[in-house]
């Protein structure tokens, strides 16, 4: 297929977001995380306003040692994280899932980190509410993954709208060895003779052609974009050696504005380089 599109015009149609209503915060995940430690948090609530908080904490710990596991979240850390503190006396590596220091040293952590002050001076009134807010803030770290998922969901919806059926002629997150087995095709040209494990986001099968599809979205710039463009250019070139197989790349995001040179090179040799605007204009109907 000869490339007839104008790169700059195509680039100008990149969208600024793929965020849907639930993109910004995964509230079900937040509620689930809080619910799993709600009892321990309510036990810790008894320390709010304490006049002898160190002594009260030690007494509380003796009866409810599980309260130690909620401490990391009070400073926006996960239980699995080792919390490292550099002290003039020595370095500490606190493990809150399995105690590795004396309880007195953990008490020192709560004192010096400011947690006791938070509780003793009524800076919070309820730790369940407080941790819910912490979880919302920490959930923003998951937006990067949700961006990729959102882009894949968009692409899948367009593929299914064209009549592709998951498990029949549409496959998701499938490795090259599975593709070779299902479709009796040799992909060694793009896998270094089978020495490289390659997984594609989607594969679709038409009457004549098998399409190997990669999907991504970049809202910001960075070296990753150039690496991706170069990598997919190579795959596009290598795929030409495989009969009845085409490589398709569906990407979007205004991060490409600052990484357009490598993208242009791939655009020039890859006829099946699309964005969401292309999908909206029924580009998939043109596939053989």
Swiss-Prot record:
It catalyses: Endonucleolytic cleavage of DNA to give specific double-stranded fragments with terminal 5'-phosphates. Its EC number is 3.1.21.4. InterPro entries: Restrct_endonuc_II_DpnII, Restrct_endonuc_II_DpnII-like. The keyword NADP does not apply. Keywords: Endonuclease, Hydrolase, Nuclease, Restriction system. It holds the Pfam family DpnII. GO terms for biological process: DNA restriction-modification system. GO terms for molecular function: DNA binding; type II site-specific deoxyribonuclease activity. It is an enzyme of class 3 (hydrolase). Belongs to the DpnII type II restriction endonuclease family. Homodimer. This is Type II restriction enzyme DpnII.
């Amino acid at each position: 297929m000869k490339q007839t599109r104008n790169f700059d015009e195509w680039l100008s149609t990149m969208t600024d977001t793929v965020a849907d209503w639930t993109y910004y915060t995964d509230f079900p995940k937040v509620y689930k995380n809080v619910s799993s430690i709600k009892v321990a948090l309510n036990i810790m609530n008894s320390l709010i306003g304490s006049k002898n908080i160190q002594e009260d904490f030690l007494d509380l710990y003796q009866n409810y040692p599980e309260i130690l596991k909620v401490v990391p979240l009070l400073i926006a850390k996960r239980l699995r994280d080792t919390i490292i503190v550099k002290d003039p006396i020595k370095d500490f590596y606190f493990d809150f899932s399995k105690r590795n220091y004396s309880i007195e040293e953990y008490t020192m952590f709560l004192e010096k980190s400011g947690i006791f002050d938070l509780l003793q001076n009524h800076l919070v009134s309820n730790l369940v509410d407080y941790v819910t807010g912490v979880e919302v803030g920490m959930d923003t770290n998951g937006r990067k993954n949700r961006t990729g998922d959102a882009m894949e969901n968009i692409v899948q919806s367009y593929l299914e709208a064209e009549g592709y059926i998951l498990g029949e002629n549409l496959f998701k997150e499938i490795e090259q060895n599975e593709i070779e087995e299902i479709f009796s095709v040799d992909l060694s040209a793009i896998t270094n003779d089978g020495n490289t494990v390659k997984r594609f986001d989607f594969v679709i099968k038409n009457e004549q052609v098998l399409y190997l599809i990669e999907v991504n979205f970049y809202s910001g710039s960075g070296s990753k974009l150039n690496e991706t463009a170069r990598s997919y250019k190579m795959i596009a070139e290598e795929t030409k050696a495989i009969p009845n197989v085409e490589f398709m790349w569906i990407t979007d995001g205004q991060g490409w504005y600052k990484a357009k040179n490598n993208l242009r090179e791939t655009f020039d040799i890859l006829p099946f380089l699309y964005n969401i605007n292309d999908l909206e204009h029924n580009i998939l109907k043109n596939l053989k």
